[in-house]
Structures are given as structure tokens and as C-alpha cells.
Amino acid sequence: MIPPEIRRSVLLQKAIKLALAGTLLTFASFSATAADPSSDTETPQPPDILLGPLFNDVQNAKLFPDQKTFADAIPNSDPLMILADYRMQRNQSGFDLRHFVDVNFTLPKAGEKYVPPAGQSLREHIDGLWPVLTRSTKNVEKWDSLLPLPESYVVPGGRFREIYYWDSYFTMLGLAESGHWDKVADMVANFGYEIDAWGHIPNGNRTYYLSRSQPPFFAFMIELLAQHEGDDALKEYLPQLQKEYAYWMEGVETLQPGQQNQRVVKLEDGSVLNRYWDDRDTPRPESWVEDIATAKSNPNRPATEIYRDLRSAAASGWDFSSRWMDNPQQLSTIRTTTIVPVDLNALLYQLEKTLARASAAAGDRAEASQYDALANARQKAIEMHLWNNKEGWYADYDLQNNKIRDQLTAAALFPLYVNAAAKDRAVKVAAAAQAHLLQPGGLATTSVKSGQQWDAPNGWAPLQWVAAEGLQNYGQDDVAMEVTWRFLTNVQHTYDREKKLVEKYDVSSTGTGGGGGEYPLQDGFGWTNGVTLKMLDLICPQEKPCDSVPSTRPASLSATPTKTPSAATQ
């Protein structure tokens, strides 16, 4: 475990903005070890900056089916020397770019295909996967895009060879359900380390993910750990919770009504809410060619604007969805940064409530009251600006047109999940979700078929869990059971047929993995494993747990959420 003094070290924000703005700076090597997040450590540069024209040429040549492959490749020597060699050789007769890459880089190894023992139940399969998906990267190669972490961690699986921020919370739910509290503690420690090192939790532990975060679930992770360790977990990680909050709220003190700065927005009435934002406005290294093609398809918009909105959608976790687009069939109409997301603000409400609880646990009642006041102000802003009264559901706010958006998405359940919804509105959301999103195989992400992976007909494990728990918070147990039972049936049928759990599911039926998006369907899969275990224990009583989904639907869920309802639910 990381010593508390390292966890609590107060670090200055790194010079990330300059390094990640796209300027090719002289490379300063950094200690590729997770021993100490020292403030003297330079922010490591992503491969598109390190390798400049070489990176661009390799990605545009499409040497690899997945653009993430070269983004994850490790230079075998100083990148500046490789780049100099490239500039000298590339115009020579017979130059072979693929051979040059093979000589100068170590490509990521293809993961060994896991073959589970025959006859395993769903629970046995998941329990057997935890060690398969566990990684340890305390030390990495000098120029690796992988960022070292002090403790072991569980990855999602497939092409996702690193830890991911919001994925990890749902993975942790399963680890806790399996009794692996040591792994939960290790992963929380890693995220605390990242906050100390970088000022925030990046999208994943790669240099090219440092310019953005993801849905802020760190507070939920601390609350989960506190179920096992008590208030000590809250007190121990209070400094990191405060730093994460500072990251999301950076610049709020200088905003005038109607202005935005990075991740924070002040509306005309003075309400403060947040949006997703990436500090860079260039193509994503892991999807370089795709982003360039998207920008070129809409010459009426500046390419940098499109790149920023693509990156910010990646920060949202919903990459990509009609939710962020003017035209669901045209990705280049994406404008994530002009949308105030309801789910993000619900999560930040939870962060403020957890900060209040942690401050109280640490004995600082005055600070606890301040965080409670911030949470109450955000809750009022959610009710004022993120409720669509005409449609009867929570939705996103459109900064460009100064109005609430009409689209219903699974994000509408997040205010229920964090107990921030008014009771009468929660009932309306439950009815809307049941009428428009509930499908034979679970809850659809949206009702729009755009070909993007965060749209119909796909359903995702984390959104099933948020919906089921949120609905239970407000006594909507019948709808919660339908979401839980239908999704579990989908997972079970797919497992019966393919002997694996996957990243996303087609919820228009049962037994089929989802499609769409930038890459093939991935298996593993961290958050599906975690949510499946939790749901198995929801539908089966504690005295008679089930290892697979039973053949007949139970009359009711066997457990209820343990969160204490906020004043909004009274």
C-alpha cells in the first residue's frame, strides 16, 4: 500500500496545459516508477507529441487494424533519436515504414486467449477471471505510454490493457462481492496516487489519457471502501477527494454568469454546473485516423473544435452517442462541450455529499457544512435546469441554445441513483424509462439508432446498475426488477452460448453482444463481471445464493440499496 504521507502530499498542478496543447517540446524523461508522485516529476508526453510526424505517418498508413496498437507501442530508444533516424531515412529508396516500426518499437503483445474450465457457472467464471484480468505495473519502460501505478489493478479486458477510471468502480463492486477487499483497497490507493501525481484521475493510466478525466466515481469508491474499513477510509482519502473536487471546479471563482471555463459552467442565473472537457484539441492518439476523418467530413467547422468535442465525449464515457450530436447520423456534428450533462452533475453532487461526510468524520464540522451547502445548491440547479418539465424526465442542458434538451437517455436515472431527485419526478422518470428504454434484454442507453455504441440497441452494465439502484431508492421496485432480470437473462444467455461476458449487450433481445462504435466487441469484461455478481445477489436471497441466473423470475429483489436518502427523497 502507498504510505499515507505520499497519499496526502500536496502537489502543484503540472505544466500539463503547455505540454498537451500540441506543441512539440524537448522530451524530459521521467522516473518510470510508482514510488513517489513528486512535484518535480515532469508530466510525460503522449506519443503524438513525442514522435511528431512519425506518429502521424504510422497512424495514417494504417499499419495496424487498431489505432491503439501504435499508441501503446514502446520506443526501444530515445524517441528524439528515432525521430531523427526517421527523418533521415523516410525519403530513401526502398524505405519500409513497417520494418522501421518493428525495429524501433516493441508492440503490445496480444493477450493470451483465456479458456475457462468446462462446466463453470456464471459466478465461477467471473471469480476465475479476477486473476486473469489483474495487472501490476509498478515499473514501466522509460518511454512507455503506460503510466506506472504502485498497486495491482484489474483491467476491463481485450484491447483495454490499462486501468480505466469509471469502469473500475463497477469492477470493484464485483471484487467486493467476491470478498476481494484487498484488491478494492489497492485500486483505491492507485487512484489516490494518480490524484496526487496529476491533480486528477485520468481517463486511464496512459500518457495520452492525461488531458481528461472520466465520470467522477472516486467518491463512490471511497464510500464502498468505507463499508469495509469504516470512517477511516473517508478520513484517509479526504485530501484526494478535495483535490479531485478542485480539478472539476477549477476557475469557478472568476466566472461571470453566462461564462464557462474548462469543466465548470455558470448559467445566467448564477447556477454553477459542470461539463466534460479535454485540455487538448488534437486527434486522439488511440483513434488518430478516425478523428481526422470525422473532422474532414465537416469542413464548415474548425477541426480543432471537433477534436475537442470528440475528446470530451471520451471523457464522458459515452463515446459516442447521439446525446452529444446535432445530427445523430453525423458524428462531426458532435458538440459535447456545449452540453451540461445530467449524469456528471449528479455524480458531482455525490462527491460534494461525500466530502461533507468525510469532513465530518475528520472532525471539521464547518467544512462539512460548506460542502453540504454546495451539494444543496447543485441539487437546486439540477432541479431547475436539468429537468424537462414538458417530457417528464431529467435531461441535459444545451448551452448553445440555452434550453433543456428533449432526448431521453439512461443518464436520466442518475439523479435517482444519488438520491438527488424529487419524489414525484422520480416516479415520472421510472415511467418514462419503462415506456421508452426498457427492452427484452435490459435498459437501452437511448432510443436512437445511430450506429454509435452508446445508443440503441446497446445496453451497458454500469447503466443497468445505476438504473436498478436508483429506482429502488425511490420505491420503484417493479421497474428495478425488470431492468435487473432482463439484463441478467441477457448476460446468462450470451454466456451459455459463447462462454464469456462482454463489454456491452444488444438489449433488443437476449443472448447477443452489442455492436457499433470504433472497435470490435471486447470480452472480459470488468464492469459486466462486477454488475453481474451484484445483480445475482440482488435476485437471490442471502440464505440461498445463486451461481447462475435462475430459470424462473423471483417475485422481488432480495436486497435494497444501503445509501441513506437525502432530503430530496423525504
Swiss-Prot record:
Family matches, as PANTHER family: TREHALASE (PTHR23403:SF1)
Family matches, as NCBIfam families: PRK13270.1, PRK13271.1
Active site: D319 (proton donor/acceptor), E503 (proton donor/acceptor)
Gene3D superfamilies hit by this protein: 1.50.10.10
Bias kind Low complexity: ranges: 554-570
Protein role: Provides the cells with the ability to utilize trehalose at high osmolarity by splitting it into glucose molecules that can subsequently be taken up by the phosphotransferase-mediated uptake system.
Cellular localisation: Periplasm
InterPro entries, A to Z: 6-hairpin_glycosidase_sf (IPR008928), 6hp_glycosidase-like_sf (IPR012341), Glyco_hydro_37 (IPR001661), Glyco_hydro_37_CS (IPR018232), Trehalase_periplasmic (IPR023720)
GO function term, MF aspect, one: alpha,alpha-trehalase activity
GO terms (BP aspect): cellular hyperosmotic response; trehalose catabolic process
Taxonomic placement: Bacteria, Pseudomonadati, Pseudomonadota, Gammaproteobacteria, Enterobacterales
Signal peptide stretch: 1-34
Binding site for substrate: R159, W166, D167, N203, R212, S213, Q214, R284, P285, E286, G317, E518
Family: Belongs to the glycosyl hydrolase 37 family.
Organism of provenance: Salmonella schwarzengrund (strain CVM19633)
Keyword set, alphabetical order: Glycosidase, Hydrolase, Periplasm, Signal
Listed name of the protein: Periplasmic trehalase
GO cellular component, one term: periplasmic space
Catalytic activity: alpha,alpha-trehalose + H2O = alpha-D-glucose + beta-D-glucose
Entry keyword annotation includes Glycosyltransferase: no
Primary location group: periplasm
Subunit note: Monomer.
Top-level EC class: hydrolase
EC number: 3.2.1.28
